[in-house]
Swiss-Prot record:
Pfam families: EF-hand_7 (PF13499). Residues 29-64, 98-133, 134-169 form the EF-hand domain. Ca(2+) binds at D42, N44, D46, D53. GO terms for biological process: myofibril assembly; platelet aggregation; regulation of muscle contraction; stress fiber assembly. InterPro entries: EF-hand-dom_pair, EF_Hand_1_Ca_BS, EF_hand_dom, Myosin_RLC. This is Myosin regulatory light polypeptide 9. Residues 1-20 are annotated as: Disordered. Myosin regulatory subunit that plays an important role in regulation of both smooth muscle and nonmuscle cell contractile activity via its phosphorylation. Implicated in cytokinesis, receptor capping, and cell locomotion. In myoblasts, may regulate PIEZO1-dependent cortical actomyosin assembly involved in myotube formation. This chain binds calcium. The modification N-acetylserine is found at S2. Residues 1-16 have a biased composition (Basic residues). Its main location: cytoplasm. The modification Phosphoserine is found at S20.
Amino acid sequence: MSSKRAKAKTTKKRPQRATSNVFAMFDQSQIQEFKEAFNMIDQNRDGFIDKEDLHDMLASLGKNPTDEYLEGMMSEAPGPINFTMFLTMFGEKLNGTDPEDVIRNAFACFDEEASGFIHEDHLRELLTTMGDRFTDEEVDEMYREAPIDKKGNFNYVEFTRILKHGAKDKDD
């Protein structure tokens, strides 16, 4: 009996506590949102995000990512990407980053050419069909003062600057 207790005590010392620190970085609602995002990306529902999951997710958004692009994304992780690793990676990215960078990088996820622009129709589709969905009225409100050129390209770099620092006066 005492040998079983000794084994139990040794077993208790083995679990790594690093994962619990990751979960402590976020409140429950944030963790739930990350879980929803993870599940949206984990297309084959195997509990891991792999290159095929990323490809399928981007293809569902109308993108045709190259293997090189996908490999670059996968190389961000030191190993298989389960939910804990996903949360850890976001924790590292969000820890100490400027909110302006976070907002700009969120838009950049959908800018495959890294041009700083997303076509307004495509952005509307994304905002009204993914995550915390916007209504068409909310998108219209956002577009009222948004930097959109004559070709319908939404300048998310400038928009992020406006969100953070305010709009420039039109009289200047």
